[in-house]
Every structure is written in structure tokens, then in C-alpha cells.
Amino acid sequence: MNIVEKTDAEILAIAEPLWRDLVKYSNEGKYGEFARNFSSSLARAMDQVAAGHQFANSELARSLSPAIDTLGIIRRGEHVTVLYRQRSTKKPGEWLGRLVLGYEDGKVRIFGATLF
């Protein structure tokens, strides 16, 4: 099944635990756990040294609030993008979280995850 064929509720049931894991492992600085659900292409593209440096030196990456607001879902091709309002426990303001999901080898994987 193509993930774009799933209902919003089905997509969110998959996406929210993945996003919460990203927040948790980012806060804890655990890169291996953070990247465990990445697609093979995203995992290859991530530089572990740069990611480790980001975890160690970014106050935002280490202070993400577990409270999120889902803003919407965008379907395109074989992927869905779930948008979140993300906050920090230490920095004022809000960030846009973007989680791109799709299937790889029959399993839902993360093809992109960013904060703007």
C-alpha cells in the first residue's frame, strides 16, 4: 500500500510515535536511537559527526518540548509530510517540524525530519 492512500488518522497514528521518539532522542543526544527509523537514503546522507556536534551544541536540539500540535498532512507521490508546531522547554517561540514518511522494504520509514 502507498502511504498516501491512508487516512489522516492512520497516518497520524504512525507519525506521532515516530516524532515523539525523535524529540526524546534528540533531547537525550542519542544519535543511534534518533536515526533508527530513518530510510536507508536518509541514514546515508546524515553525517554522524555533524549530527553529534548538533546534539552537543544546540540548545534547541536538547530542549524540545514533548507537547506538539499537528498542523496538517501533505500527500505527494509515495510520501506524506506531517507538519507539527514544536516548542522548546528553554527557548521562547515556536518552530515548524516536518516529518516525511514513506515505505521502504514494506516498512514505514522516515525520509526527512527537520525543524524550521
Label every PLM stretch briefly.
Residues 52-103, 112-116:
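Surface-exposed, charged secondary-structure patches
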Residues 43-55:
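Short, charge-rich amphipathic alpha-helical segments embedded
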Residues 27-41:
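Short, well-ordered alpha-helical segments enriched in acidic and aromatic residues
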Residues 17, 24, 36, 53-57:
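Charged/polar, solvent-exposed surface patches and flexible loops
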Residues 1-28:
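Short, low-complexity N-terminal intrinsically disordered segments enriched in polar/charged residues
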